[in-house]
């Protein structure tokens, strides 16, 4: 039995509007706080006298634990539903941030970071399946709104955290948002309805495995996941090294470089909201390909530009690639069979987050070989490949998947 609903409802207003707002605010906090740690690393490194390798390892812990939660969360979605998982994510993430307050050693900082990665890892798969089944008529716009809110959080919260840290210390910057996580947990519980289709029992293990294997042989899913992985690979590398590149190679101050990174997320937020509307009108595959193609020139231009204004404009425009996220998420989730949707989506997210996280490693190796400029050309080439893949995506026809 399908869980799809809302075939003819409005994106805003009513119960669906309240649900969309609560999920968007939650993602604003979850994604934004994931980029606060990198922003505060210089301060944390000074306190604990860390090497760059140790500081980088802290970020690795955050993303690895986040990726590790994607599959088990997807499995849980098919059994307990999104409501409980979204609330648990907000509660656990808030508790993890409190752990930073009582972390006198770097080892405990790593523990807190791992806990935060685990807590935030519950949010993504649950958010995806909830939006897909609730906003069938406005799927692209709904995903764009929520992921756009996350991009605003990624732009705003790191900047705010550095201001708080300068006055009150980095621990205060981490725990300042804990009350907001608590409030979001309450609102999510009130606005997200439980599933009414027997989700709590879930399909049998053997049947789930068979459905997963069948899903991963679907050409649409293979192409979509490949394109998504290539785009995420570039995004991870870009956000990890844009500030370093602008500071070391283009000789901008770290403050200016950090502001350009924030500009990237602002452009990403705007393009995500607009991309969803365009896809709802012109189709997902053509829109995805167009976004990927438009994302190539900024990557090619960066190594060939000088001057603060030019670098600020082009560096910010690299955020256009972020609008691929909500569209490809909607395409993949909407293609998966209903009865294993959460499980399959969680497994796929674990896969492309794990592979995509290697982008920063590859670019880091190239940078140490004095090939920093060439790294951006590599990212541009991979983005072109993603565009070609998106052009071959068939129109989506939702399978029922349930009997």
Task: Describe the residue ranges of each PLM region.
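Interfacial helix-cap and linker-helix signal at transmembrane-aqueous boundaries
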Residues: 44-45, 76-77, 160-168, 246-247, ...
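Helix-breaking motifs and short loop linkers at transmembrane-helix boundaries and internal kinks
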Residues: 49, 81, 101-107, 136, ...
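Cytoplasmic helix-loop-helix junction between adjacent transmembrane helices
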Residues: 110-152
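Helix-loop-helix hairpin linking two adjacent transmembrane segments in secondary transporters
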Residues: 137, 145-196
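C-terminal transmembrane helical hairpin of 12-TM major facilitator-type secondary transporters
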Residues: 282-328
